[in-house]
Amino acid sequence: MALKQEMAKSLLKTASLSGRTKLLHQTGLSLYSTSHGFYEEEVKKTLQQFPGGSIDLQKEDNGIGILTLNNPSRMNAFSGVMMLQLLEKVIELENWTEGKGLIVRGAKNTFSSGSDLNAVKSLGTPEDGMAVCMFMQNTLTRFMRLPLISVALVQGWALGGGAEFTTACDFRLMTPESKIRFVHKEMGIIPSWGGTTRLVEIIGSRQALKVLSGALKLDSKNALNIGMVEEVLQSSDETKSLEEAQEWLKQFIQGPPEVIRALKKSVCSGRELYLEEALQNERDLLGTVWGGPANLEAIAKKGKFNK
């Protein structure tokens, strides 16, 4: 009996590892399926009914992409169409083999005020809320797993879902006058785009509970003190702060795309997978760069790195 139980545990763990590996690496794989009551095409049709704004993507020759949340008349709130466009841009970025880094920003010097209330008012049932929740969790999880080093450039306000989006980025930078606020409690809800889970990982459970239950207004100084952001930029000017963010990001993406992308994938697997599976993935990723052009060039130079 004990042997059978041990075998069952082993099989369960193997199945779980296999599922998690597929989840991490299979492009287009959804967190949810019809078995969870999630019908993606139906959700897309619903979201299509709420137009407004756009998600704009600019891909630079230096391997940095700039993703702009563009709905300034509503503080860059997400309309239904913008949610759909965000998924489209994530898929495009998944296939951008020359990409190394990504900056997420809002148009007109403000980040985002979250969901467009016009859409929210029309999606009033718990079933509606959970459907959008699953759609955005899918999208932002795929975003988080992009093989690009991502930075949220917080200019102005990041409210509600906008604050949640910042947590899907690898790093966050704020301008001196900007603020982040998880305002969900004041709306009678909780974060539902994965923001709670990611916030706990970023600042710890105690700080996350304070930030969420207090609906705290985090200015740049407070956000820096609790580890929410990496740095406060010098300028609040829209153009200058974007230039600062680009310079900040460049220090982490020096090198060939295949190496930067492998590093990001390895970190993702280390965060999300069991130890054995993460180590195997690290091995497989090493195989994609060992003996490659960058590796051979570094060996030929016989560089010293302890200076």
UniProtKB/Swiss-Prot annotation:
Keyword Magnesium on this protein?
A: no
Q: PTM N6-succinyllysine: at which residues?
A: 217, 301
Q: Select a single GO molecular function from the record's annotations and give it.
A: methyl/ethyl malonyl-CoA decarboxylase activity
Q: Which residues are reported to carry the modification N6-acetyllysine?
A: 217
| Signal peptide coordinates | none
Instruction: For this UniProt record, give its keywords in alphabetical order, as a comma-separated list.
Output: Acetylation, Cytoplasm, Lyase
List the catalysed reactions.
(2S)-ethylmalonyl-CoA + H(+) = butanoyl-CoA + CO2; (S)-methylmalonyl-CoA + H(+) = propanoyl-CoA + CO2; (2R)-ethylmalonyl-CoA + H(+) = butanoyl-CoA + CO2
Where located? Cytoplasm, Cytosol
Q: Name one GO biological process term.
A: fatty acid beta-oxidation
Identify the enzyme class: lyase
- GO CC entries: cytosol
Looking up PANTHER family in the UniProt record yields:
ENOYL-COA HYDRATASE-RELATED, ETHYLMALONYL-COA DECARBOXYLASE
Task of the protein: Decarboxylates ethylmalonyl-CoA, a potentially toxic metabolite, to form butyryl-CoA, suggesting it might be involved in metabolite proofreading. Acts preferentially on (S)-ethylmalonyl-CoA but also has some activity on the (R)-isomer. Also has methylmalonyl-CoA decarboxylase activity at lower level.
- What's the name of the protein? Ethylmalonyl-CoA decarboxylase
Whose protein is this, by species? Homo sapiens
